[in-house]
């Protein structure tokens, strides 16, 4: 059976096409991140750009070769984008009945510890499922550096694992943009402006120019939240930090703690949910 997995974030979507056929080892890892196995194809697109959505139609139609895959989707971009993606899928496959994943109180041996489980964002929940699948039995700090930066904690328990909760703060690009828009004389920077000078300034606790001072200040805020959470968890026992999201490379340069890059946790979680129980 072929499966199409789609992770729709606030600005971009990522997708994976996998099936039950054997797969060569080189297809299992892409960009340093483990992908669902068997994994055949994958990609990304800016979902608000019609041309990029249209390009998906041809790609998916070719992969389907006249069949209709089982489709699993985690969407945090809202109903307008959901409707647009429904149209893309219908163009590619004809009539479809995708599984729009929702947050639940538990999945397998992972328990959702939110006071109101359905309030937890579906991306955070499915990403936690993927992280737990990837590293079962481990206590995890899952950091997603995207439009928002989220820090989520999964702890190992005697009979499985528990999603404990986490933190949400403005993402790096939001911090940079908000500072510029709400001040009269500070320039607007983007994530690509947070380079080596900003990283040095974070470590030196100061910058000798405004550009690096802004970039380093926002990086230090991101790194400070992550490192504080990591230290608190490390004080209880072993913990592994998984770093993902579009700004992960910029944030990584400011961290003074061990971490691992893994940018496909939501796709891994969708794959786990799609497999028969």
Swiss-Prot record:
Note the subunit structure: Homodimer.
Pathway listed for it is: Cofactor biosynthesis; coenzyme A biosynthesis; CoA from (R)-pantothenate: step 1/5
Residues in the active site?
Answer: 123 (proton acceptor)
* Cofactor(s) the record lists: NH4(+); K(+)
Tree of life domain: Bacteria
Keyword annotations from UniProtKB, A to Z? ATP-binding, Coenzyme A biosynthesis, Cytoplasm, Kinase, Nucleotide-binding, Potassium, Transferase
User: What is the protein named?
Assistant: Type III pantothenate kinase
Give the UniProt record's GO annotations in the biological process aspect. coenzyme A biosynthetic process
Q: What is the lineage of its organism?
A: Bacteria, Pseudomonadati, Pseudomonadota, Betaproteobacteria, Burkholderiales
The UniProt entry, under CDD domains, shows: ASKHA_NBD_PanK-III
The EC class name is transferase
* InterPro entries noted in UniProt: ATPase_NBD, Type_III_PanK
């Amino acid at each position: 059976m072929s499966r199409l997995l789609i992770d729709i974030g606030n600005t971009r979507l990522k997708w994976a096409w996998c099936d039950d056929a054997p797969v060569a080892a080189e297809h299992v890892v892409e960009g340093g991140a483990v992908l669902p196995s068997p994994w055949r194809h994958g990609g990304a697109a800016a979902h608000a750009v019609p041309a990029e959505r249209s390009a998906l139609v041809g790609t998916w139609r070719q992969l389907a070769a006249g069949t209709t895959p089982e489709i699993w989707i985690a969407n945090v971009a809202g109903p307008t984008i959901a409707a647009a993606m429904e149209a893309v899928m219908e163009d590619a496959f004809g009539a479809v009945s995708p599984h729009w994943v929702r947050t639940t109180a538990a999945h397998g041996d992972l328990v959702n510890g939110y006071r109101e489980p359905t309030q937890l964002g579906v991306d955070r929940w499915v990403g936690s499922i993927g992280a737990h699948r990837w590293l079962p039995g481990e206590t995890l700090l899952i950091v997603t550096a995207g439009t928002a930066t989220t820090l989520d904690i999964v702890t190992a328990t005697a009979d499985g694992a528990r999603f404990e909760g986490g933190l949400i703060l403005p993402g790096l690009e939001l911090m940079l943009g908000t500072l510029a828009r709400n001040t009269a004389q500070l320039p607007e920077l983007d994530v690509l402006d947070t380079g080596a000078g900003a990283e040095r300034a974070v470590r030196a606790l100061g910058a000798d120019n405004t550009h690096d001072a802004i970039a380093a200040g926002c990086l230090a805020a991101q790194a400070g939240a992550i490192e504080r959470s990591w230290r608190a968890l490390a004080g209880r026992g072993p913990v592994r930090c998984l770093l993902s999201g579009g700004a992960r490379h910029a944030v990584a340069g400011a961290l003074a703690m061990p971490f691992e890059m893994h940018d496909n946790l939501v796709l891994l979680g969708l794959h786990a949910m799609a497999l028969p129980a």
